[in-house]
Amino acid sequence: MAQVINTNSLSLLTQNNLNKSQSSLSSAIERLSSGLRINSAKDDAAGQAIANRFTSNIKGLTQASRNANDGISIAQTTEGALNEINNNLQRVRELSVQATNGTNSDSDLKSIQDEIQQRLEEIDRVSNQTQFNGVKVLSQDNQMKIQVGANDGETITIDLQKIDVKSLGLDGFNVNGPKEATVGDLKSSFKNVTGYDTYAAGADKYRVDINSGAVVTDAVAPDKVYVNAANGQLTTDDAENNTAVDLFKTTKSTAGTAEAKAIAGAIKGGKEGDTFDYKGVTFTIDTKTGDDGNGKVSTTINGEKVTLTVADIGIGAADVNAATLQSSKNVYTSVVNGQFTFDDKTKNESAKLSDLEANNAVKGESKITVNGAEYTANATGDKITLAGKTMFIDKTASGVSTLINEDAAAAKKSTANPLASIDSALSKVDAVRSSLGAIQNRFDSAITNLGNTVTNLNSARSRIEDADYATEVSNMSKAQILQQAGTSVLAQANQVPQNVLSLLR
């Protein structure tokens, strides 16, 4: 080998090897300090690309798992609201069963309907206000896609349905709808109700005021109607007097009258304090004189005491034919009503509905005025019409009664088959709740699968990019030894040109 000083080949060779060991040492230290086998693309270009794709998948699937948990939360929120709607529907059904019982009064039905209305309004409130992260989940039909994968199209769809009173088929649900108005309803529900009932007795027609019961003729200029005191017939003359029937007319009866004999016989057969009836009057034996029938009896008529005295029956008489009767007051019987009076003249009385019925009067239609509007009622008073249309009584939420025609009543009538309507609504709610329960289970399965996939991808990525510490420590030790050896050898290689000086001495 030539002896030269310009180029130290041994030194250059040693430096090159030292640089290689330095690079190996740096790489080993970098991997050991980072824990990664691939710290840059130069370490393993293909491996870095593969590991990066794994990282994308891992991050995407991890977020997808969180998305699936959000999906469960949405389903739980919606299902919780539906549970409360279900509770309200159950109460509405319970109230509807109560309302169908025939023992309920109008006020009972109104109270039941008031609570039903509040429950239905609460259903609408829950529907309109239930939301998840600002998204209303029951106010409209909606399909919410939940991303449960790392790539496009990997979604699970939650079907959200609009659930409110209308969508449940309970819009206008009513157990206390309007009912056909009757004359009694008008009189009890409204103020300033006037009118009359019409009656016909033979060729004559009459009106009866619905409030006072006064009877007048059904004419352009109606006259007041009276009952004739003599024969009980209807008349428009109030001045005619009629003679009453004698009961005890004279204060001094002649001997042997039927009255005297009857009362004398009662005294003879009784004792003081006994009572007996005669001509519909109850008498008391006040005084009994002997055993022949002489004595006094008394009674009270129209609040006044009347005393009858029986006398002139001889002692030991075999009968009472000779008895005389004296009355403290003249007493008569009315030919009209059979009541007792002390006057032998009775005046015609104002006719009443009972007098019309006694004269076989037949009731016709009625004319009723309510708040200035005139209505017609049929003969029985159970059907009110206006312009040919049947009228109905409707009560507002505040309990105020109003009259509406049959067209308006049809829109507010009681719900037909209310229990079937509620059962249908409950079935719809149950179907939506079942769907939400199933979707929650599906999300649970998706989350489990995503967790397994992320675990496996992490393992695969680790095998590609993570550093093997056993290998890297060996590489580092080797590089350190080579560095030490190379440094020592380089020092000796740098001394080789010194040998040329020995030739120059």
UniProtKB/Swiss-Prot annotation:
It is found in: Secreted; Bacterial flagellum. Pfam families: Flagellin_C, Flagellin_N, FliC-like_3rd. SUPFAM superfamilies: Phase 1 flagellin. InterPro entries: Flagellin, Flagellin_C, Flagellin_C_sub2, Flagellin_N. Its main location: secreted. Keywords: Bacterial flagellum, Secreted. GO terms for cellular component: bacterial-type flagellum; extracellular region. GO terms for molecular function: structural molecule activity. Individual Salmonella serotypes usually alternate between the production of 2 antigenic forms of flagella, termed phase 1 and phase 2, each specified by separate structural genes. Flagellin is the subunit protein which polymerizes to form the filaments of bacterial flagella. Belongs to the bacterial flagellin family. This is Flagellin. The gene is fliC.
